[in-house]
Design a protein with these regions (language model features):
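Transmembrane helix-loop junctions and nearby membrane-interface residues
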Residues: 62, 81-88, 109-116, 137-140, ...
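Helix-loop boundary elements of multi-pass alpha-helical membrane proteins
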Residues: 28-45, 80-99, 114, 136-152, ...
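Generic multipass alpha-helical transmembrane bundles of integral membrane proteins
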Residues: 146-255
Length: 324
């Protein structure tokens, strides 16, 4: 397959080569190199301090005052997303920023800033974040590594939304002064399970947003990137999945119609977690247990990763001792 570049030269469209590797900083601008050498490296040196500080602020405000928590959330959320954008720009991973999870996070920011009383925005945000986005913690194998900025950012993107919507949805159970929030934050106290308009919105909103996202994702991946042959920045979740054995077992040859197959797998995942969103929305106890499960999974998964790293260090030390 060929295309005509902007200079009128006929070129071959690059294929998705699983062995393709690049130097991510090769050809970067002076600004990018300066930011990486003088800012990012110094920020990484204090990852543990930053992460513990931010978690303590969010945990304290969440447990005491919902208003204060939403203010802290906006500050932390904005910082996390902007910092991730800078890192992905430097690493040439910008394609990750068009994933479905980021739509849910942007929607949460919109709810927090402009639509705390808008039922439709609340239902959209809740149904998206309490299902597919939060369960991506398991699907993407997230772990709470306080020494790694990228891992921590992924944890925040997948868990902050579900924790926030849990607090907003069940504030009448969680806060003694919840009456103060009436009129300023959406009132959800009287929502009960029944097949009504609210139920249908919780059921369908994630799919409406998914369709919009899928169309945009498909166009960007199959048209824009392919047209200009941006193979060196083709770094997205699809690149992770198409290399996996599970992907090949389900959909066959990963070099054919990769984007469509990835979207199909994404849709299957969304269909599978839809009942989870409904259970979370209508049951306080289920929602609470689910949130605890997500947090425990992050901690447990990190303990497994830490154990593996320790075993590697021990094996290297044993080999070194044997040589001596």
């Amino acid at each position: 397959m060929e295309y005509i570049d902007k200079n009128g030269i006929k070129r071959k469209v690059p294929t998705l080569d699983p062995n393709f590797k690049i130097d991510r900083f090769e050809g970067q601008s002076k600004l990018a190199k300066y930011i990486n050498n003088n800012f990012i490296s110094k920020m990484d040196a204090f990852t543990s301090v930053r992460s513990v500080f931010l978690v303590l602020i969010l945990a304290f405000t969440l447990g005491n005052n919902l208003y204060h928590y939403l203010i802290a959330l906006f500050i932390v959320h904005t910082y996390v997303l902007v910092y991730r954008g800078i890192r992905f720009w430097l690493e040439r991973w910008l394609m990750y920023l068009i994933e479905y999870c980021y739509i849910g996070n942007i929607l949460l920011i919109h709810f927090n800033l402009f639509a705390r009383n808008n039922m439709n925005i609340f239902l959209s945000t809740y149904s998206m974040t309490s299902g597919i986005i939060s369960l991506a913690v398991v699907a993407c194998d997230n772990h709470a590594d306080i020494t790694d900025t990228d891992f921590l950012t992924s944890c925040c993107i997948h868990t902050l939304p579900v924790a926030t919507m849990w607090a907003v949805r069940w504030k009448h159970y969680l806060y003694d002064n919840y009456l103060e929030y009436k009129g300023n934050i959406i009132d959800t106290e009287n929502i009960k399970f029944q097949i009504d308009e609210t139920f249908l919105k919780v059921l369908t909103y994630p799919f409406i947003y998914w369709i919009v996202w899928a169309v945009i994702y498909f166009i960007i991946n199959t048209k824009t990137l392919r047209k200009y042959a941006y193979s060196d920045i083709y770094q997205s979740t699809i690149g992770d999945f198409y290399k996996s054995k599970d992907f090949e077992c389900l959909f066959g040859d990963h070099t054919k119609n990769t984007v469509i197959k990835y979207l199909m797998m994404h849709l299957i995942f969304l269909l599978g977690v839809t009942p989870l969103s409904l259970l979370n929305f209508y049951s306080f106890y289920f929602n609470t247990i689910y949130l605890i499960f997500i947090l425990l999974f992050l901690g447990y998964n990190q303990s497994i990763k830490s154990k593996e790293e320790i075993n590697k260090i021990v094996k290297k030390a044993e080999k070194f001792d044997k040589k001596d």
